Amino acid sequence: MRRNRNIYTLLLLGAIGTFFGHGMWAIDAKETFVALFTGTFDNVFGVVVSTDTAADWVQAIGWFDIAITAVLTVMLIGNLQAKGALYEFAYSRVAMVIFAWAALWGFLTAASRVTAVGDFYPEVWDLVERAPNFMLPAALLYLAYQHRLDHSQGQLTAKDVLHKTSH
């Protein structure tokens, strides 16, 4: 159990760093992020978005990333305490929804490296390089789910559940 908690801590630190760093760049309306936004809307949806409008949206998204970072930090504190309400929150259904959102958002932003340009190759390597942006929260989602299964009624483990459903 402690080993999973340590892994959870490391993954939370990685996700916090990812979302905080990207959030700060977005709040600053980083030129690359604005170009990814306008390029994706043009190539995928056929909608031309002005640079000013894109910069406003990118900044708003940056603040949302910072909010996610704050929630992830609360989860980290709870996980480190290993007891109490914050600990329960770190593995709650709400936490799982946040991890699912973060994984989806991480994938979409990584994929924007491909969609903004419109060519799959060689831009696909930019997506591959950014796999941790979505895989860190996906791993957290898995561990939170595993934790909930392990602590459900009767102390069932994920292996027990899978074994029961396979027969």
Model features per residue range: what roles?
Residues 1-167:
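Membrane-interface extramembranous regions
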